[in-house]
Amino acid sequence: MKLGLSSWTYSWNIGVPGYPQPTCPMTAMDLLKKAHELGAQVLQIADNLPLEALSLEELDALAAQAKAWNISIEAGTRGVQPHKMTPFLDVAVRLGATFVRTLLHDADGCPTVEEARQNLLALIPELEKRGLTLGVENHDFFHTLQIKELIESLNTDCIGVCLDPVNNFAQGESTLEVLTNLGALTVNFHCKDYTIHRKSSNLGFDVEGTPTGEGMLDVPRCRKFLHEDMSCVIELWTPWQGDADATAQVEADWAQRSVQYLKTVL
């Protein structure tokens, strides 16, 4: 497995909508520099740092620097509508990416499983033409068995699962269920560690992120469900610290600790 960082590793450093912004928000090039600094082999730039907002010159500069540092770029977006996805696939190709991550839903809403299937079927020739693999991330809106049936129904090697072990808590599914149902179809792994603790009132539980290797996610166990030929991309759910820059600093520290841990187990 290749160790990767993501724009979702550094959400607070980039800026989270609805919260105070950091003094110096990270750009895509800043993110690439951080990946190089920490020794990551892969950088996944997703929808919280939209690649389609970059100029052609910025995309070319990013691609050239990534190549110079031997870092593979992975492109991330939301949605599966062909009229939106096809131009984004061209952005991915321009960056030299061979992998694209997406979600079934976007700002326009969430499709039904059948609508998603028809959209993905229409994308297959576009992916094949460009030599791209698409990873559909499991998320809150669908049970993993629905995702499994959807991906298997496409009968193609160019679309698989981008597996997040924590997102389906909202569907009442454990990490083990997610890995069992989707592991064999996975083409990209979001390594997101977490902890669950009871509220001070004893009435309910809170789920929070932790640095990778310091929470409840058993990474070596996860690997047993996954193919080796994919990237393991760190994502963080760093809690808000009451101040934008303080939160960004904690997040940066967590990212470094996460990389250090993964280097011992990958």
Label each residue range with its predicted role.
Residues M1-A97, Q249, Q256-L266:
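N-terminal pre-domain/capping segments
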Residues L3-Y10, L43-I45, I71-T77, V100-T102, ...:
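Hydrophobic faces of well-ordered beta-strands that scaffold small-molecule active sites
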Residues L5, A35, A66, A92, ...:
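Conserved, mostly hydrophobic/aromatic
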Residues T9-S11, D47-L49, G79-Q81, L104-D108, ...:
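Active-site-proximal loop/turn and secondary-structure-junction residues that shape catalytic pockets
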Residues C24-M26, L56-A61, T86, D90, ...:
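Charged helix-capping and loop-helix junction motifs
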Residues E58-L59, Q65-V161, A170:
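Active-site acidic/histidine proton-transfer and metal-coordination neighborhood
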Residues A122-M216:
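Acidic/histidine-rich catalytic cores of soluble enzymes
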Residues G213-H227:
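A short, acidic, amphipathic alpha-helical segment used as a generic capping/interface helix at domain edges
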